[in-house]
């Protein structure tokens, strides 16, 4: 039993030492940030965990899997990336807007900003929320953008 523990310990230590050399790249330092807009106005979105996703692709490497970027409730998104050209697309049927998978080409270098223009089914404006005697009340205007929505 002692011999098995010793062999297992040496094997584990060897694997640990070998694994240190596998990740020899510096971490990415460039920052991509953007917003999702309609007619120049930033959209508010449903903020569930992983709700609205964008996908980044970088050509020229063996791994062609997308880098998933999540949008926040205020319609912004961000990612820390390596410098280089990326393709940004919305995930298929993943947002409250007309499904459009146009590719946005983004050259990431340092601090980079971009805008994803979409056509939402509806917009909400003039939100007014009040609290009176532990009763929450709210009003807003809803505009239908897509007529067959």
Predicted feature residues:
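Structural motif
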Residues: 24-25, 35-50, 145
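Short beta-strand segments within Ig-like beta-sandwich modules, predominantly Fibronectin type-III
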Residues: 67-72
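C-terminal motif of bacterial Sec signal peptides marking the signal peptidase cleavage site
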Residues: 16-19
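Structured interaction patches on ligand/partner-binding surfaces of diverse proteins
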Residues: 93-121
């Amino acid at each position: 039993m002692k011999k098995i523990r010793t062999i297992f310990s040496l094997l584990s230590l060897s694997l640990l030492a070998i694994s240190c050399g596998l990740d020899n790249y510096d971490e990415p330092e460039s920052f991509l940030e953007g917003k999702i807009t309609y007619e120049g106005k930033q959209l508010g979105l449903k903020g569930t965990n992983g709700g609205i996703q964008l996908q980044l692709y970088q050509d020229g490497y063996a791994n062609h899997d997308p880098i998933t970027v999540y949008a926040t409730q205020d319609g912004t998104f961000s990612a820390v990336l390596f410098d280089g050209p990326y393709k940004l697309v919305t995930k298929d049927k993943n947002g409250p807007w007309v499904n459009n998978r146009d590719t946005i080409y983004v050259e990431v270098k340092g601090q980079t900003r971009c805008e994803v223009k979409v056509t939402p089914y509806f917009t909400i404006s003039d939100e007014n929320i009040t609290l009176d005697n532990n009763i929450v009340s709210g009003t807003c205007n809803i505009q239908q953008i897509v007529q067959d929505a």
